[in-house]
Amino acid sequence: MSNILIINGAKKFAHSNGQLNDTLTEVADGTLRDLGHDVRIVRADSDYDVKAEVQNFLWADVVIWQMPGWWMGAPWTVKKYIDDVFTEGHGTLYASDGRTRKDPSKKYGSGGLVQGKKYMLSLTWNAPMEAFTEKDQFFHGVGVDGVYLPFHKANQFLGMEPLPTFIANDVIKMPDVPRYTEEYRKHLVEIFG
C-alpha cells in the first residue's frame, strides 16, 4: 500500500477553533489505515523540524493537505510550512526551476525531483459550492481548483501530480459534520481503496 503524509492546516483563530479540520484529519487517518496505508500526520501550526519534514515528503507516496479556506486560500501557517519545507528541500525535492542558462528553452517548473508522487487537497470553506462553480457568483465559475491554482503549482513544481480535490462547503452558515465526514470517507475510499 501507500505511504501517506497528512498536513493538518487547522488553526485556532478568531471565530474558528480548527475543529472541523482536526476531525477530517482523524477521518482520513482512520480510513486510510483501515485500507492498509501507512500514515504520518504533521500539524502546520507546530514546531516541526524542517529537515524531518523534507524526509516526510521523500517517504510519502501521497501528501494530503487538510486545511480551511482563509481569505481565498491557504492559512498563513500552511504557506509558512510550504516556504520552510520546500525551500529546505532544494536539491532533494526540486533541483531548479527546470531551465538552465545553456538551455533556457526548457519549461519553467520542470525541475522537480519527486515525480510519481501525488498530492490531494481537502478543504473546508464557508462559501457554498455555487460560489466556485457559477459564472455569476463570487469566483466567476473558475471552480475550487481554479481558486487554488498557485497552491497546485507549488506542489507541481516539485514534480507531484494532483488527485481529485475534496471540499466541505457552507461549514459555518449550514454546518453538517456527519455529512462532511461521510462524503470524505467515500472520497478517500474511491481514491485509495
Curated annotation (Swiss-Prot):
Cofactor(s) of this protein: FAD
Species for this entry: Escherichia coli O157:H7
Keyword Oxidoreductase belongs to the record: yes
Name of the gene encoding the protein in the UniProt record: mdaB
InterPro entries listed in its UniProt record: Flavodoxin_fold, Flavoprotein-like_sf, NADPH-QR_MdaB
GO CC annotation terms, alphabetical: cytoplasm
Residue stretches in coiled coil: none
The UniProt record lists the keyword Ligase: no
PANTHER family referenced in this protein's UniProt entry, alphabetically: NADPH:QUINONE OXIDOREDUCTASE MDAB (PTHR46305:SF3), PTHR46305
Protein name as catalogued: NADPH:quinone oxidoreductase MdaB
Family from the record: Belongs to the oxidoreductase MdaB family.
Keywords: Cytoplasm, FAD, Flavoprotein, Oxidoreductase
EC number of the protein: 1.6.5.10
MF term (GO), any: NADPH dehydrogenase (quinone) activity
Catalysed reactions listed for this entry: a quinone + NADPH + H(+) = a quinol + NADP(+)
Localization, UniProt: Cytoplasm
Sites where the protein binds FAD: 16-23, 69-72, 108, 124-127
Record note on quaternary structure: Homodimer.
Function: NADPH-specific quinone reductase.
A Pfam family the protein falls into: Flavodoxin_2
